[in-house]
Structure formats: structure tokens, C-alpha cells
């Protein structure tokens, strides 16, 4: 007897905790959030057969420090994502835990015109993808910082 995959059921649960605070009229503040995701399906790395799972689920966290006053906005964000199953099957792939530091600075000249610069992955964190074991390295992406400089005009 066979059952189509699209008739299976699972339950995914999640919680998000978030805090934000500004320090009076100084323009300084912070944001922090933590997202917890869990499902009732576990992937058994010891089985060499097809398993039904929901890939891509993992906990995440972000910590942001910012300044926002008189048209100047500065934002630094530390982002974290826990290890997650990227693809299942006989040869599963796991994306390892990952941190990334980003920044964004912008200045609003008026309601229509603003300038910005942003940096993504400032600390040049690498990304590792492994198979059933962390010793089975499948992909290694060298992390490079990326920068954007731009102008926004609304009319």
C-alpha cells in the first residue's frame, strides 16, 4: 500500500520573543528577538531511506542597535540562525549554525531625497553545509562583505 506524500500531516509550532527599547529622546535604542520553531517530525541520520520532514526549520535570533534622529539613521544588526536540514533524502544536507553582522546608514535630506550605505556580512562569516556528519563537508562558501551605496528619491 502506498500513500501520497501530500496526504501526510505534521504540526509545526513556533514562538517569537521580542523586545524593543529607546533611550528617551536620544535617538538610541535596541531591538532583540528570538524565534523558536519546532515540529513533530525528526530526521534520523542513521536511516538510509526516504523520510518525510519539513526542511528549513531552525531557531533564529537578532540583536539590533540603532540611532534614529534628525534624518540620520544608523543600524547594526547581529543575526544568528541555528543549524537546519536543507534537503532530505538518502543524502541529506545540513546548513550549519551561522552568524552575520550587517549595518545600514541613511540620511534623509527631505521627504523625497535620502542617501544610504549598507554593509552585509561585515565580519565575512563563511557558510558550511555538511551531510550526515559534520565531517562530511559538502559545500563551503567563503563569506565576503558586500556593500551598497545609493540614493532614494520619491516623487
Name the predicted role of every residue range.
Residues 7-9, 53, 93, 97, ...:
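Residue-level "hotspot" positions that anchor or transmit function at local structural transition points
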Residues 80-85, 106-155:
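C-terminal beta-signal and adjacent terminal beta-strands/loops
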